[in-house]
Amino acid sequence: EGAGSGFDLGHQGLQLTMRMADGRLPDHPLRLQIWNQMGCDSHAAVKARVVQQDFGTADFAALAPLVVEAAAKNCPGAEEIVQGSAAALSRCISTVAQQLSLRSPLVVCHGGAVTHLQGFRTAVQQAIHQSIPEARWGKAKGDACDGALLMAEALTLRPR
C-alpha cells in the first residue's frame, strides 16, 4: 500500500484530473496545473505520457505538491485524496501501536510527503490525534537504519 507517499498522492491526483476531463467530476484548475507540469494538453496526451519509459514514480510524486495545495484551497477531490491518504497512514500507525500495546506512542514520520508537504503533514497529525489522542509527534534523529541499530544495541546490552 502506498498510503502517505508522494507517488500515491500524485497518482490519485492524476486520476482525479482524468475524471474531471471526461465529465465525471466538475473541472478545476488543478487539472490544468497537473497536465501542464506533465507537458500535456489533452486526455489522450496524458494517457500517452504515463506509459512512456521515462515517466515513473518520481514523476507521479512530483505532482503531489499540486494536489496538497489544491486541497488547501478547498478542491473537493484533492481534499478527499489528502484526507484519505492521511487516514490510511494513521490506521497503519494505530494498528502498530495497538499490536505493541503502546498507549502514548512517539510517532516519527521521516521523509517523503510527510516531511516535505506541510499541508499533508498537518492532515496526518490530525488523523493520528483522532485515532490515538495520546500519541506524541517527534522528530527523527536519524533514518530507519539508525533506529534499527539503536534497537539492536539495546537488545545486546540488556542483561540476560
What are these model-predicted stretches?
Residues L14-R160:
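ATP-binding/phosphotransfer module of carbohydrate and carboxylate kinases, centering on a glycine-rich
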